[in-house]
Amino acid sequence: NKYCNIKCSKVAHTVCQYGESTKPSSKCNKVSITSVGVTEEEKKLIVDEHNRFRQKVAQGLETRGNPGPQPAASDMNNLVWNDELAYIAQVWASQCQFFVHDKCRNTAQYQVGQNIAYSASTAAYPGIVSLIVLWENEVKDFNYSQGITKENFSKVGHYTQVVWAKTKEVGCGSIKYIEKGMKSHYLVCNYGPAGNYMGQPIYTKK
């Protein structure tokens, strides 16, 4: 397949390594999969929630931080959905290698970034927006003037990708499954072009 021509520092592309199918892999047998993929409604929710939060930050309305508030931004793009990013994210989500990032997810167009989220409940499957909010909440630990560092990256890296100004497109894959009686929702979002370059500001201060 065409993805076998895309190499990332010698590592095979996810779609080359695991194949073109988005069906759950045999690794998923340890859980009970109930749905694969995002619905049209969920796609809209994902894009709208990212843009709502990006605009909130860009307008200087995010009061949280370490220290807060976050400065306003002058260069924040509005994100649009990208089906190819979503497809590659879904191939990876369907491997059930939970909480691990894949090694090569780029497209011919983009270097691609990634966020992963998980939530579970006994009552109902956690909604897709609640998973994105987990990423946004990392803003509480972010110091804009310090930026992304090796030390803080694990605490703030999802937030910084969500609001990385130069990112233009997002596409996500998801699986819902039951494990030990818990209704679990696992979300992988891919971003193009990627954010989270150390030493670069996440956006230009207004």
Swiss-Prot record:
Broad class of the protein's primary localization: secreted
Sequence intervals crossing the membrane: none
Gene Ontology terms: cellular component: extracellular region
Pfam family, one: CAP
Tissue-specificity statement: Expressed by the venom gland.
Keyword tags: Allergen, Disulfide bond, Secreted
Disulfide bonds: 4-16, 8-104, 28-96, 172-189
InterPro entries: Allrgn_V5/Tpx1_CS (IPR018244), CAP_dom (IPR014044), CAP_sf (IPR035940), CRISP-related (IPR001283), V5_allergen-like (IPR002413)
Cellular localization per UniProt: Secreted
All residue ranges annotated as the SCP domain in the record: 48-191
Family to which this protein belongs: Belongs to the CRISP family. Venom allergen 5-like subfamily.
Protein name: Venom allergen 5 2
Organism annotation: Polybia paulista (Neotropical social wasp)
